[in-house]
Curated annotation (Swiss-Prot):
Protein name in the entry: Transcription antitermination protein NusB
GO molecular function: RNA binding
Gene source species: Rickettsia prowazekii (strain Madrid E)
Organismal lineage: Bacteria, Pseudomonadati, Pseudomonadota, Alphaproteobacteria, Rickettsiales
Function: Involved in transcription antitermination. Required for transcription of ribosomal RNA (rRNA) genes. Binds specifically to the boxA antiterminator sequence of the ribosomal RNA (rrn) operons.
Keywords annotated in UniProt: RNA-binding, Transcription, Transcription antitermination, Transcription regulation
Gene: nusB
Length: 155
């Protein structure tokens, strides 16, 4: 029997998006408590419906680094997101999950990644593909690509 695994950093990225989403939903509830709850969930696999031979574990250090970096740069991240919207009111009406995903992905792309930009873009586009609608997936891919180009992360 083989054991299937998903990259630990990929799981950390998903968990970071979950933490930011939960933080927004709970009106900036204590991020430390949210992080602990998410880590406990992933540690126990209690709320994850997977085949028994499928193992999920996350890179705790990558998860904590992403969440901490988002909060250290949250105003700058929101400014970057808002600057890439075509309409100012889009910011107010942006779905919470989309905003959480953009905050984490842009943060990793610009402020805390030794991972190549193309890998970051692909990872978050894959996450978006699992969580968002078709229009939002294209938007995530487009905005990350533009930001990477603007910051000379890719040519």
């Amino acid at each position: 029997m083989s054991t299937n695994k998903i990259n630990k950093k990929s799981i950390a990225r998903i968990a970071a998006v979950q933490a930011l989403y939960q933080n927004i939903l709970q009106n900036n509830y204590d991020m430390y408590d949210i992080m602990q709850n998410i880590l406990a969930c992933y540690h126990s696999n209690n709320s994850i419906d997977l085949p028994k031979n499928f193992k999920i574990s996350l890179s705790i250090s990558h998860f904590k680094m992403l969440v901490k970096s988002v909060f250290e740069n949250i105003n700058k991240l929101d400014e970057i997101i808002d600057n890439h919207l075509t309409n100012a009111k889009d910011s107010v009406h942006m779905p919470i999950l989309l905003r959480a995903l953009l905050r984490v992905s842009i943060c990793e792309l610009l402020f805390c990644s030794t991972t190549p930009a193309k890998v970051v873009i692909n990872e978050y586009t894959d996450i978006a593909n699992d969580l968002l609608n078709e229009h939002e997936i294209g938007f995530v891919n487009s905005i990350l690509d533009k930001i990477a180009q603007e910051n000379n992360k890719i040519s």
